[in-house]
Amino acid sequence: STGATMRQMTAMRQFGMHLGMCFQLKDDVLDYSDVEDIGKPTMNDIRDGKATLPLLISLKRATKEDAEHIREVAEALANKSPHIDPFEAEQEIKSFILRYDGIRYAHQEMEKHRKKAIAALSIFPDNKYKESLITLLNYAINRVK
């Protein structure tokens, strides 16, 4: 037994869920960064045929023509089509996501989850343990790799 109340366990579960969302959203954003900035390959999700929140929201906001074109480019990239240049395709997708504010939207969603995670901890007294959890949360959001 942890000695925690149901309310405390629920709060920690909520904190963990929102922390996980922040981590995943940051991972999605980093995938659209430049390799030089993060020191590892980028655009992995797109190349694997996975649509992340920045792409999904950009597709939703885009004109029908732009969305259809980017879907074709992303599909060709994922299928390793010999008819496209992978670097140019990646740059086109990145530009599309920036044009339709997909990255900014993901950052706004991270901030919503950050606030909810901190709110979940509000039932606990201020101490080094709570501070450590908040530090972990901030790291998940502010990491550059």
Which residues fall in each region the model found?
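All-alpha prenyltransferase/terpene-synthase fold signal
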Residues: S1-K145
